[in-house]
Amino acid sequence: MAKVLIIEARFYDHIADGLLAGARAEFDKAGVAHDLLVVPGIFELPAALKLVLTAAEQGNDKARYDGFVTLGCAIRGESDHYHHVGTECMRGIADLSMAYDLALGNGVLTVHNEAQALARSDPARKNLGGQAARACLRMMAVKRELGLSS
């Protein structure tokens, strides 16, 4: 059975709740087992992903996953912090995804305000958590179609 790791940034709990609910619903519908790793904010997502990959490389079977989903949110504020954190988060996730041939769905929101975040995280609305899970599942299928192991 396939197994996926959801790495979730909980900086905005009420937004993270919606993203996680959407992702979990998609994996449950697909019959895919999923674990959860929680980090403080989106800046920590790439580091957490790299730690999991390192643990798997060092033989930790509990750290072996067929796919990954990253979830979190950055909301623009009064300073440039949002831009720097969002850029580094996305770069780090993309770099690891390509370097390790990961089946990964990215559900990190970078939005201008809370209303945008709520609309995108709500499973009954834009459901970006669910979209990230579906992207992960599709990339897992692509790897299988190409004969690549997890």
UniProtKB/Swiss-Prot annotation:
Similarity comment: family membership: Belongs to the DMRL synthase family.
- Kindly provide the name given to this protein in its UniProt entry: 6,7-dimethyl-8-ribityllumazine synthase
Task: Say which species the protein is native to.
Answer: Paramagnetospirillum magneticum (strain ATCC 700264 / AMB-1) (Magnetospirillum magneticum)
The Enzyme Commission number assigned here is 2.5.1.78
Provide the top EC class.
Answer: transferase
Its Gene Ontology biological processes? riboflavin biosynthetic process
What is the name of the gene encoding this protein?
Answer: ribH
* Source species, domain of life: Bacteria
Gene3D superfamilies for the chain:
Lumazine/riboflavin synthase
